């Protein structure tokens, strides 16, 4: 069974090694080029200052990761977060993603995040060589529902891709307490 822990900047090379093939060979990421290691570390620093970034490990190796980041960087949206997950190809379909997302949701709930959003590419044709329905199906199995559909919004590999926003509510919508940054939650501060 994989174990989970918070990511550190020392994990950046292993995490980038998981992410880069998604950029280079799929339309799962709409980036055209993988970020440099320095840029990836900078992204991680920005996330870890506010949100959790989790890694799953098994037998001493990182199997995948999941993190949250601002849904929209405006004060009124602070109780919403966008979530992202990437797994090593050989770890998909083995419960690693479910484990990561379940813990990520628990931590985000402790931050008083109420709604989670995932931006997911959708193939326009069956048997697309660069994009499948794996991510939309995974998110549906995790309780996400479609909140928005944007046709022809991503162009990669000489073809157009649709994009959906998926939403999952993890908290009530009464007047929320103040948003808490992840380092405070992790330290057990109220």
Regions found by a protein language model. Give the residues of each.
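A structural signal for short, well-ordered beta-strand segments
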Residues: 83, 116-118, 166
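Short, cationic low-complexity segments
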Residues: 179-190
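Acetyl-CoA-dependent GNAT
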Residues: 34-90, 101-102, 107, 111, ...
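A short beta-loop-alpha structural element at the N-terminal edge
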Residues: 3-15
